[in-house]
Design a protein with these regions (language model features):
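Conserved beta-strand positions in the central sheet of alpha/beta enzyme cores
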Residues: 30-34, 54, 101, 153, ...
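Short amphipathic alpha-helical segments
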Residues: 44-45, 166, 209-210
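Histidine-acidic metal/acid-base catalytic patches
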Residues: 1-4, 16-19, 88-91, 96-98, ...
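Short, hinge-like loop/turn segments at secondary-structure boundaries
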Residues: 49-50, 71-74, 118-119, 171-172, ...
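Active-site-proximal loop/turn and secondary-structure-junction residues that shape catalytic pockets
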Residues: 10-12, 35-39, 57-61, 104-108, ...
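A short acidic, helix-capping loop that chelates divalent metal ions and anchors anionic groups
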Residues: 63-71, 161-165, 236-238
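Active-site acidic/histidine proton-transfer and metal-coordination neighborhood
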Residues: 74-195, 205
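N-terminal pre-domain/capping segments
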Residues: 1-94
Length: 283
């Protein structure tokens, strides 16, 4: 059976290690480290994290926060993003994790507080240029990942109506099924063994914004899905709400994947244990 992780992403007001301890002390076996508050000396915690967790996207948080963007043209953000991913590949090896996942790139550089909200109008790269930058960095990072037996996973972005209206174009990469599939063909052309981490909640909001069929999109993407992020929402905002036994994504769920991460916010360990139970009943 696929592994089931719980994300620390919803615990905004404490650091990831405290969230890890809380979950582990309350019957949660596997934890995905994501977000949270800044803390010093992540390396000293690596031994206690061994065999119990994996790292996702922007973690450990930097003292001066930024948005991880592997398609950025900004020299400072580019360097910070590349180094964060590079370090996380090495950290993943040290904690015996087989995977490291991160978001697809952006055509703009949003501020951390803008994530999930309306971005302020900024200089925007062409889709072609942003994809080329993203791809070049993936080629370099994949070499390091392969050397350390880590498989990289790209998570689909979420586009809401506010940002589409503001920019009059989609400022994010990999939000629609066609774009995701076409980009993964390029990865295959360059022989990059990189998988898709499908965030079903992101797909739901993007479907409503961009007007594509949600169930068909999920079905079409099945062939490249390696793992899932699970939560639910109203289709307008990526709110990380609880899913239920009747949630939309069960219909075309790919059951044989490497792992599922429950990325639900504002719940306690009892809520997570119930969500694990629902997920297991569907597998």
């Amino acid at each position: 059976m696929s592994l089931i992780y719980i994300s620390t992403g919803g615990y905004f007001d404490q650091n990831g290690i405290k969230s890890f301890d809380y979950l582990k002390n309350n019957k949660i076996k596997l934890v995905e480290l994501s977000g949270g508050k800044y803390f010093k000396n992540f390396k000293k915690y690596l031994p206690k994290l061994k065999d119990n967790c994996q790292i996702h996207n922007y973690f450990p948080p930097s003292k001066n926060s930024f948005v991880l963007n592997l398609a950025s043209k900004d020299p400072i953000i580019s360097k910070k993003s590349f180094n964060l991913v590079k370090n996380n590949i090495l950290y993943s090896k040290k904690i015996n994790s087989k995977y490291y996942s991160f978001h697809a790139g952006f055509r703009v550089d949003p501020k951390p507080k803008e994530l999930g909200k309306k971005f302020k109008i900024k200089k925007i790269l062409s889709k072609t240029e942003a994809e080329e930058i993203f791809l070049k960095r993936l080629i370099k990072l994949n070499k390091l990942a392969k050397k350390n037996n880590i498989k990289l996973l790209i998570e689909n972005n979420v586009i809401n109506k506010k940002n589409l209206k503001s920019f009059q174009t989609n400022p994010l990469l990999l939000t629609t099924p066609n774009e995701i599939l076409n980009f993964f063909k390029k990865l295959q052309y360059y022989k990059l063994d990189i998988g898709l981490l499908l965030d079903v909640a992101h797909l739901k909001v993007s479907s409503k914004t961009m007007g594509f069929n949600l169930q068909k999109a999920h079905k079409d993407l099945n062939k490249i899905i390696t793992a899932y992020h699970l939560s639910d929402n109203d289709g307008l905002t990526d709110s990380n709400k609880k899913f239920s036994i009747n949630s939309w994504f069960w219909k075309n769920l790919k059951k044989k994947v490497k792992f599922f991460t429950i990325e639900v916010y504002k719940t306690d360990y009892v809520g997570y244990l119930n969500l694990i139970k629902i997920l297991k009943s569907k597998l």
